[in-house]
Amino acid sequence: ADNKRPIWVMGGMVNSLAQIKEFVGLGLDNSEKDNKWYKQ
């Protein structure tokens, strides 16, 4: 049986559209999103 698993390329601290485009160009499969919560 073939027990190989895929390798995922993760991008950490991707905080702008420019960075997302850059990382995708480098082979990014998924990215970490940093969310900010504000009190009103």
Swiss-Prot record:
One of its GO terms (cellular component) is extracellular region. Binds 1 Mg(2+) ion per subunit. Contains 2 disulfide bonds. Its EC number is 4.6.1.-. Keywords: Cytolysis, Dermonecrotic toxin, Disulfide bond, Hemolysis, Lipid degradation, Lipid metabolism, Lyase, Magnesium, Metal-binding, Secreted, Toxin. It is found in: Secreted. GO terms for molecular function: lyase activity; metal ion binding; phosphoric diester hydrolase activity; toxin activity. InterPro entries: PLC-like_Pdiesterase_TIM-brl. Mg(2+) binds at residues 32, 34. It is an enzyme of class 4 (lyase). Gene3D superfamilies: Phosphatidylinositol (PI) phosphodiesterase. Expressed by the venom gland. GO terms for biological process: killing of cells of another organism; lipid catabolic process. Its cofactor is Mg(2+). Its main location: secreted. Dermonecrotic toxins cleave the phosphodiester linkage between the phosphate and headgroup of certain phospholipids (sphingolipid and lysolipid substrates), forming an alcohol (often choline) and a cyclic phosphate. This toxin acts on sphingomyelin (SM). It may also act on ceramide phosphoethanolamine (CPE), lysophosphatidylcholine (LPC) and lysophosphatidylethanolamine (LPE), but not on lysophosphatidylserine (LPS), and lysophosphatidylglycerol (LPG). It acts by transphosphatidylation, releasing exclusively cyclic phosphate products as second products. This is Dermonecrotic toxin LgSicTox-alphaI-1.
